[in-house]
Amino acid sequence: KYSFERFGHEVEIMNVEENDFLKDKLNHEILRKGKKTIYRNDLQSFTLLRFLAPQLNNYKDKILVIDPDIFALKDPKKIIEDHSNTSDLSCVFYDNIPRSEMMLIDAKKVKWNFKNIINNLFNFEIDYEDLMNFKFNSDLTINKISECYNSHDKVNDDTILLHTTNRITQPWKEGLEINFFKNNLSQFQIFKEHVKKIIGKSHNEEFISKSFLKHPDKDVKNCIKNLFKEAKELNYFSQEDIEKEVANLNISRKIFE
C-alpha cells in the first residue's frame, strides 16, 4: 500500500476476511484446468476479489486493480496515458495470455457482477483458469501494455510495477514456515526431489522446502527491503505494528535487517 500512496494515489484494500459471501465459498471445489480442486483459504484466496473492483467502485472511473504482492517502484500514472480509450481494460500479456493480477479497468464499461461470477465458478460453469485470463468474458476488449507494469520477479531501469510472483521467495516472508499449498506439484514430483537431495544430486529446493526461501535476485530483494525500511523510517507503521505482524507470521524480521 505504501509504495502507491507515496506517489499520492488513494488505495483501497479488498480483504477476503471482510467479504462474507466469498468466505463462505472457501475450501469448496472449483474447476481448475478441467479438474476439480479445493479453493483453499491460503495466500492465494484473495485472487477472486479482482473481479469485485468495478462493482465496489460503483462502476465509475478508471481504476487500477493489483495483487498485494505488486509494488510501485515508480509512479504508475503513465498507465492511464498508455490505456486505449476504446478498451475495457489494459493489462500485461505473458506468452500471449492476458494477466489479470494487474489491470487498469474502465469501470464504466466493465459491468462484472461479482456474485454471479463466483457462483458460476463454484457451480463448475467457469474454469478458474478461464476466469483469470478473461476467457469467461468474450466481449471484453483488452489493451496490451508494456511488461514494465507487471514485471515478474525482475528489476531494470524501465520497471514501474514489480510483481513478486513466486510465493516461496517473497522477501518479506524469508525464513518463515510456508502457509500455502503447492497445488502445481504432484506428490511424485515432491518425492523425487527429496530423493535427489538425499543422494546428493542437484534438486529444486523450492519443491521440498517447508520454509520461505531467499529471493534469487538480489536487486528484487533490495527493492522490497528498501520500501519496507523507508516506510518504517517515515512512521507509516509503528514498531508495535511490526511486532504484531511478526507474531502473526505475516512478515519476517529479515526484511528490516
Annotated model-derived regions:
Residues 11-56:
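Active-site-proximal specificity loops/subdomain of glycosyltransferases
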Residues 8, 15, 25, 111-257:
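A glycosyltransferase accessory/donor-loop signature
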Residues 1-2, 50-51, 146-148:
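Short alpha-helical segments and helix-capping/turn motifs at coil-helix boundaries
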Residues 97-98, 157:
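Short, solvent-exposed loop/turn segments at the edges of secondary structure
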Residues 49-95, 104-110:
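GT-A fold catalytic core of metal-dependent nucleotide-sugar glycosyltransferases
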Residues 17-20, 58, 70, 107, ...:
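Short, flexible loop/turn elements at secondary-structure junctions
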Residues 53, 89-91, 100-104, 142-144, ...:
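Conserved hydrophobic/aromatic beta-strand scaffold that supports enzyme active sites
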Residues 2-10:
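Short, acidic, metal-binding catalytic loop of nucleotide-sugar glycosyltransferases
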